């Protein structure tokens, strides 16, 4: 798919902006704090319904204004899709796809598929399991709305169960109905995540071999908190979760929260058999994340039938010239958006192969 046009009104430091994009490569170039990432963020917003930098939509609206408007036109193989987001400081945001208002956020997913790679993504290797769960969940949600709804349901049930445990410490509580529902939704989460990791691990391994010239072997391993076998069916997984919830009930009661279940899942990255988080060099960690992101491109292509768009925010300067070259020259079928402060990135790119946008204080020169 291709983002053909972007229109912004009162979005961050943009008052009014209309841009038409190149089908292959688009470069946003400029000094720090001019509005390069804001452009990437606005495109991402039309894909995910929220920013990747903040959970507060208010921050996206220009400081001196009360409303903001974002519109992208996406060209797909079989159709054109218009996505509109209206942000309002006094009420919830309005989303429209092809002029039809959306009732739930889940309806937006899948209209525009994006893969974002920014320096923040290093957290995926460096930080705790919640970053890796977020990665799995965001990526599965963009290819399966059923997963997205099951996850929201699971989180709601979990909140209820935790409240019950927290406010009834030392008292008898009837938790079984909640356990039943939690296990039913949780079992599906495990099935989806297991399936996703199975696919992405194969693609990431291939990708990593390619970028490291076969020197390194990357493994991506799913680590569910409730131990399940590779071929366990959903009913079996549900029983296993129920069993775990029962066994941990006294601990849960003491601590006032649910200590087992898919909300504690993790994913491990290994290079040549060693955990990248503990043993990987800075460069290896970066390359592992890059391989994972490039694997996502292929995974979405396989699931959706077209490549997603690729958003690269501030990552060029962090990659060596070989990897930079790969991103700029090898992804011929993927529309790519790059932010950079250096002209260097553009050298040996033919003018007809890209569009360059000089970003200066919320204006494009
Ligand atoms: N709600 C807002 N209203 C007005 N201006 C805003 C708003 N939010 C952010 N900005 C301005 O946007 C600018 C930052 O934009 P952005 O993050 O896109 O910079 P950048 O060009 O990517 O910079 P860098 O190279 O440092 O990453 C800042 O100057 C900031 O003051
Ligand atoms: Mg930036």
Curated annotation (Swiss-Prot):
Domain of life per record = Bacteria
Its signal peptide is none
Recorded hits in Gene3D superfamilies, A to Z, give: P-loop containing nucleotide triphosphate hydrolases, RecF/RecN/SMC, N-terminal domain
Provide the protein's localization: Cytoplasm
Q: Which Pfam families match?
A: SMC_N
Q: Name one GO cellular component term.
A: cytoplasm
Q: Where does ATP bind?
A: 30-37
Principal location listed in the UniProt entry: cytoplasm
Name the keywords, alphabetized.
Answer: ATP-binding, Cytoplasm, DNA damage, DNA repair, DNA replication, DNA-binding, Nucleotide-binding, SOS response
* Alphabetized GO MF terms: ATP binding; single-stranded DNA binding
Which GO terms of type biological process are on file? DNA replication; DNA synthesis involved in DNA repair; double-strand break repair; SOS response
Described function: The RecF protein is involved in DNA metabolism; it is required for DNA replication and normal SOS inducibility. RecF binds preferentially to single-stranded, linear DNA. It also seems to bind ATP.
Q: Which family does it belong to?
A: Belongs to the RecF family.
Q: What is this protein called?
A: DNA replication and repair protein RecF
Q: What phylogenetic lineage does the species belong to?
A: Bacteria, Bacillati, Bacillota, Clostridia, Peptostreptococcales
């Amino acid at each position: 798919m291709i983002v053909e046009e972007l229109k912004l009104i009162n979005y961050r430091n943009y008052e009014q902006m209309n841009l038409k994009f190149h089908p292959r490569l688009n470069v946003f170039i400029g000094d720090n704090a001019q509005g390069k990432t804001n452009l990437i963020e606005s495109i991402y917003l039309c894909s995910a319904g929220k920013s990747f930098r903040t959970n507060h939509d208010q921050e996206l609206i220009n400081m001196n204004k009360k409303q903001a408007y974002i519109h992208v036109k996406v060209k797909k193989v079989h159709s054109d899709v218009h996505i509109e987001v209206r942000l309002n400081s006094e009420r919830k945001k309005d989303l429209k796809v092809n002029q039809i208002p959306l009732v739930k956020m889940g309806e937006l997913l899948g209209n525009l598929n994006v893969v974002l790679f920014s320096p923040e993504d290093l957290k995926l290797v460096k930080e705790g399991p919640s970053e890796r769960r977020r990665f799995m969940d965001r990526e599965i949600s963009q290819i399966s709305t059923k997963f997205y709804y099951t996850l929201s349901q699971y989180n709601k049930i979990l909140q209820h169960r935790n409240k019950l445990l927290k406010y009834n410490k030392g008292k008898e509580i009837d938790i079984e109905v909640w356990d039943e529902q939690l296990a039913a939704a949780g079992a599906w989460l495990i099935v989806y995540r297991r399936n996703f990791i199975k696919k992405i691990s194969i693609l990431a391994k291939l990708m990593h071999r390619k970028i490291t010239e076969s020197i390194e072997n990357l493994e991506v391993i799913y680590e569910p908190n409730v131990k399940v076998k590779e071929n366990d069916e959903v009913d079996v997984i549900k029983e296993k979760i129920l069993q775990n919830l029962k066994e941990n009930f006294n601990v849960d009661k003491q601590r006032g929260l649910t200590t087992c279940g898919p909300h504690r899942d993790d994913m491990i990255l290994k290079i040549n058999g060693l955990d990248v988080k503990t043993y990987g060099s800075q460069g290896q960690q970066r390359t592992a994340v890059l391989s994972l992101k490039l694997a996502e491109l292929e995974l979405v292509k396989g699931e959706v039938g077209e490549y997603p768009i690729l958003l690269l925010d501030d990552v060029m300067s962090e990659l060596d010239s070989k990897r930079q070259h790969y991103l700029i020259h090898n992804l011929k079928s993927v529309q790519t958006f790059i932010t950079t402060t250096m002209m260097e990135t553009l050298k040996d790119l033919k003018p007809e192969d890209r569009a360059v946008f000089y970003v200066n204080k919320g204006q494009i020169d």
